Amino acid sequence: MVRAARRKRASEDDLYRGCRMGQDCPIDIKNKYEHNTLADRILKWVSSFLYFGQLGISSGKGTGGSTGYTPLGGRGGGGVTSGKGANVVRPTVIVDALGPTGVPIDPAVPDSSIVPLLESSGGSTTLDATPGAEIEIIAEVHPPPVYEGPEVTIGDIEEPPILEVVPETHPTSRVRSTTSKHDNPAFTAYVASAQLPGETSASDNVYILHGFNGDFVGQADPEGDTIFEEIPLEEFGVPDMPPSTSTPTSSFRSVLNKFQRRLYNRKLVQQVKITNRNTFLKQPSQFVQWEFDNPAYVDDSLSLIFQQDLDEVSAAPDADFQDIVKLSRPVFTTKEGLVRLSRLGQRGTIKTRMACK
């Protein structure tokens, strides 16, 4: 029996590198390089409540750190320390300070430190002068430079300067207008254009005429006129006399009048004596607030509502009408051959059980 040759598996680094590239990855290689073995998972679970310090306990290759392994009993004979070799001590070299090089000074040469300045045109010039002789001085005068730019004219200082400003030209935007025309058979529009002498444009006037060039539907008489049929209108349930107010009299109104009669009880309603009857009949609002007559609008059949501010109560012309916020419409009652006109008012204050306002 021939035994099959056993092929050696690739190294762990090559297998994990191929695993990263998408090849088939052995589960033991993947867990070892990703620190997901059973020992690593136990350390992760136990480390949640235990702390091992810097012991370096794991399934990887341990080196003991930079100082190597140290036994628990201290440094003894059996301890192994891995690290770098001993440091070599080198002797210190003393460096001497070097100063600047000395420059010799010769005090025997009495040279003058004054250097004469001579103007020259580029060549060498030699000046020989004897003591006591006169020296001729020649001065060259050059003309001022000529300015070739535009001439600037300066006028009177008191006059204001005038600057010519040229406006910028902007391109005109294009405007497009669209007109739509729709025919309406309800009316016929007549458009007339009026042109005046010397005018280049015409103004359009639109006239809407009812019945202009219209078509009548129906029978016509021999003269061409349309025959219309007149239908009389019948009225149903129209009272003989129209109502005098916006709210007609009804059964509900009669019940309301009976209820208002109960309000004339002295225990529930305060009765106010009217001294000026003419004002109470024509314009009763003058008892509540200061105002002027408005002849354009007078309607005494409506309820009057006054806008009173609760924080600032103003004085009324009549003390009995103080703090009135509403006056009802006039209520007419007949008793013993007389006609009584009354208005029910409502105050804005609140009265408690202790009679405090």
Swiss-Prot record:
Principal location: virion
Database matches in InterPro entries: Late_L2 (IPR000784)
Top-rank lineage group of the source organism: Viruses
The UniProt record lists the keyword Signal: no
Molecular function terms, GO-annotated: DNA binding; structural molecule activity
Record keywords, A-Z: Capsid protein, Cytoplasmic inwards viral transport, Disulfide bond, DNA-binding, Host endosome, Host Golgi apparatus, Host nucleus, Host-virus interaction, Late protein, Microtubular inwards viral transport, Phosphoprotein, Viral penetration into host nucleus, Virion, Virus entry into host cell
GO BP field: microtubule-dependent intracellular transport of viral material towards nucleus; symbiont entry into host cell; viral penetration into host nucleus
Post-translational modification: Highly phosphorylated.
The keyword Phosphoprotein is assigned to this record: yes
Gene Ontology CC annotations of this record: host cell; host cell endosome; host cell Golgi apparatus; host cell nucleus; viral capsid
Compartment list: Virion; Host nucleus; Host early endosome; Host Golgi apparatus
Transmembrane segments: none
Motif stretch (Nuclear localization signal): 1-10
Cysteines joined through disulfide linkages: C19-C25
Function: Minor protein of the capsid that localizes along the inner surface of the virion, within the central cavities beneath the L1 pentamers. Plays a role in capsid stabilization through interaction with the major capsid protein L1. Once the virion enters the host cell, L2 escorts the genomic DNA into the nucleus by promoting escape from the endosomal compartments and traffic through the host Golgi network.
Assembly with partners or alone: Interacts with major capsid protein L1. Interacts with E2; this interaction inhibits E2 transcriptional activity but not the DNA replication function E2. Interacts with host GADD45GIP1. Interacts with host HSPA8; this interaction is required for L2 nuclear translocation. Interacts with host importins KPNB2 and KPNB3. Forms a complex with importin alpha2-beta1 heterodimers via interaction with the importin alpha2 adapter. Interacts with host DYNLT1; this interaction is essential for virus intracellular transport during entry.
HAMAP family (alphabetical): PPV_L2
Family: Belongs to the papillomaviridae L2 protein family.
Record's protein name: Minor capsid protein L2
Organism: Bos taurus papillomavirus 4
